[in-house]
Every structure is written in structure tokens, then in C-alpha cells.
């Protein structure tokens, strides 16, 4: 909230329809300190709100304002490290398969035996939709580049992997390129970078085969910039997950978008309604003006007052032992989270 408040004076009194220009004003304002951390999140939040307002002023859905031909984007399912049991994991992917989703992503990295078993559970759940479902793995920068080559090659003896996500550090374009050239799966990365400047080395150095894009790339405007640059290099993009799939309108408008990450419903507790649903494996958007999301401020205040008994995981530290080669699983540690 403080970061958002610090940017209000930059755009106050200006025409909200000039979203791209207002985005540049905000990015230029934080030039010296750089577009990082809470400031990046604030710029992203304001940018999304401005795009929502621009579409509402035009009395049309945001996907149309952004230039999409139709209001839909292909979906894939992701467990995003919810620490599900084998049975819960199968139930989750099976529910997504029931609405036509034909691929999924799962966390890997700590234990090959568990990884292989759980990839199999994911594959079996999606086989009700497709005999060869799209299977993605995400090691969240836990492995070194050489470890990734070793482990991904082993996984590929058992499964056809569509892409391997973050198999090296986000900024290590040499390592990512090394992995890409030594495994069959496509290499995806970029979700933890902030803007087009940080993404450029990965793209220009042919370090990634697929780019993760999302609201974290400085909002809709920044994510579209990254995606357009990827288009020039024939690199497809995949949209990251977000509550109520609010980035789906941009995904629908990108000519090089392949699939958007979706998670099990339940993170929309602050919304009264949202104008999209999953059907036949696609996020289908309606025609309500703007994002089509109704936010309930009272629900937000009520959620802020809840004591969950623990602090949230943010800022999501890197797991102990990453890239050290010697980390064993501790007693009681969940080996797939």
C-alpha cells in the first residue's frame, strides 16, 4: 500500500486511457532505485487497474481492448507446491481434466523416486483427456545447470516432458542455454524477472525456449513488452497464474502465447464475481467491461484481520542446499514441496 501511495502523484490528474504513457512515467520515476521489489508490484497493480479502467471507459471487455480476436486462452494445471498427498494430487489434476485441461506442471527437485512417481500420477490423471498429455516440471532454481541436465535426462527416460522450468538461476543465461542444448524438453524461465531489460539477455542469448510472463513483469504493459520481444525471436510465452485468472485477457491477445497456468479455485476470496471459467481446456472470458472482476473491500478487510497462526512464506526464500549437490532430505521433510 505504501509503494502504491508513493506513485499516486506521478499519475494523478492525467487521462487514465493513456496507460502505456502512464506506465512509462512510473518506471521513469523509480529510475535510480530501479523497478524492483515492492515498487515493481505497485507499478504492476496500478497498471492493471488502469487497463481495467480503460476498457470500462470503452464499455468493452479488456481482452477486446488489448486486441484479442476472441476471449479465450488455453489453460494448463499447476499444483504450485501445495504439498498435496498422492491422492490429493491425482484428485486435483483429475478435476482439471474433467473440464478439458490436457496438461499440467509439478514441482520436482529433491527426490528422484518421488518425482518420477508423482509425474506419473499427473500423467495418469490427464490421460482421460489425452493419451500424451503435456507434462511440465518446475525445479524453481534448486538445481545447478549440470544437475539439471543429469536429472532431466533421467526423467526423460520415463516421460515425455514438454518443458522444464527454472532449471538454473533466473539470470544465468549461459547455464540455461547449456541445459536447453542438452535435454529434449524445452527450457522455460523468466517468472522472477521484472521487466524487458532483465529478460533481454535470456532471449537474445537463446537461453530459453519458452518465456514465463506475468503481472510481475511490471503489469500488463510490461508483460506485453516482454511477449512482443519474444515474438521477434520466435519464442512462445506462457502466462503465470494469478487470482481469478486476471491476466487471461492479455494471454488471449498475444500471438505467441501457448498456455496459461491455472490453479485450483479458492484464491478468489476477496472477489464477489469474476467473468471467466474453464471449458474444454480453455479459459473462456465473458463480455463484462474491463476485467469483469467485482472486488469486495469488506472481504479484504475481513481477511486482513484473520490470524492464521503463522506468517506467510513471503519472500519465499531459496531452499537450503540448493545447487550444493550434497543436500539430503531431512527427517520429516516433505520431499516434493
How would you describe each model-predicted region?
Residues 13, 60, 185, 235, ...:
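Short glycine/serine/threonine/alanine-rich loop segments
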Residues 106-241:
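Catalytic core of soluble alpha/beta enzymes
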Residues 7, 46, 59, 122, ...:
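Conserved, mostly hydrophobic/aromatic
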Residues 79-90, 112, 116:
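Active-site beta->alpha loop and helix N-cap motifs at the rims of alpha/beta catalytic domains
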Residues 95-107:
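Catalytic domains of carbohydrate-active enzymes, especially glycoside hydrolases
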Residues 58-81:
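N-terminal small/glycine-rich loop or linker at the start of catalytic domains
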Residues 1-57, 330, 334-337:
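Metal- or metallocofactor-binding catalytic centers and their adjacent structured scaffolds
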Residues 242-337:
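Flexible C-terminal active-site loop/helix
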Amino acid at each position: 500500500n505504501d509503494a502504491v501511495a508513493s506513485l499516486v502523484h506521478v499519475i494523478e490528474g492525467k487521462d487514465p486511457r493513456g496507460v502505456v504513457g502512464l506506465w512509462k512515467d512510473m518506471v521513469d520515476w523509480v529510475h535510480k532505485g530501479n523497478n524492483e521489489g515492492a515498487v515493481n508490484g505497485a507499478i504492476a497493480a496500478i497498471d492493471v487497474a488502469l487497463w481495467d479502467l480503460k476498457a470500462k471507459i470503452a464499455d468493452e471487455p479488456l481482452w477486446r481492448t488489448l486486441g484479442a480476436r476472441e476471449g479465450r486462452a488455453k489453460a494448463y494445471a499447476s499444483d504450485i507446491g501445495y504439498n498435496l498427498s498422492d491422492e490429493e494430487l491425482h484428485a486435483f489434476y483429475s478435476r482439471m481434466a474433467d473440464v478439458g485441461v490436457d496438461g499440467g506442471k509439478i514441482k520436482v527437485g529433491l527426490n528422484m523416486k518421488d518425482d518420477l512417481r508423482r509425474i506419473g500420477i499427473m500423467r495418469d490423471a490427464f490421460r482421460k483427456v489425452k493419451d500424451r498429455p503435456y507434462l511440465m516440471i518446475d525445479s524453481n532454481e534448486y538445481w545447478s545447470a549440470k544437475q539439471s541436465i543429469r536429472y532431466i535426462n533421467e526423467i526423460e527416460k520415463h516421460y515425455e516432458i514438454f518443458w522444464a522450468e527454472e532449471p538454473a538461476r533466473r539470470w544465468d543465461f549461459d547455464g540455461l542455454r547449456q541445459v536447453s542444448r542438452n535435454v529434449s524438453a524445452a527450457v522455460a524461465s523468466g517468472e522472477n524477472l521484472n521487466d524487458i531489460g532483465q529478460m533481454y539477455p535470456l532471449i537474445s542469448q537463446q537461453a530459453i525456449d519458452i518465456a514465463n510472463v506475468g503481472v510481475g513483469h511490471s503489469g500488463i504493459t510490461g508483460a506485453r513488452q516482454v511477449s512482443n520481444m519474444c515474438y521477434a525471436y520466435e519464442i512462445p510465452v506462457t502466462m503465470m497464474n494469478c487470482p481469478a485468472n486476471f491476466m487471461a485477457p492479455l494471454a488471449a491477445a498475444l500471438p505467441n502465447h501457448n498456455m496459461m497456468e491455472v490453479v485450483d479455485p479458492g484464491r478468489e476470496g476477496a472477489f464477489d464475481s469474476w467473468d471467466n471459467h474453464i471449458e474444454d481446456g480453455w479459459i473462456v472470458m465473458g463480455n463484462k467491461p474491463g476485467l469483469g472482476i467485482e472486488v469486495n473491500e469488506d472481504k479484504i478487510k475481513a481477511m486482513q484481520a484473520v490470524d492464521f497462526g503463522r506468517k506467510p512464506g513471503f519472500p519465499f526464500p531459496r531452499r537450503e542446499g540448493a545447487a550444493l549437490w550434497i543436500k539430503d532430505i531431512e527427517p520429516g521433510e516433505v520431499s516434493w514441496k
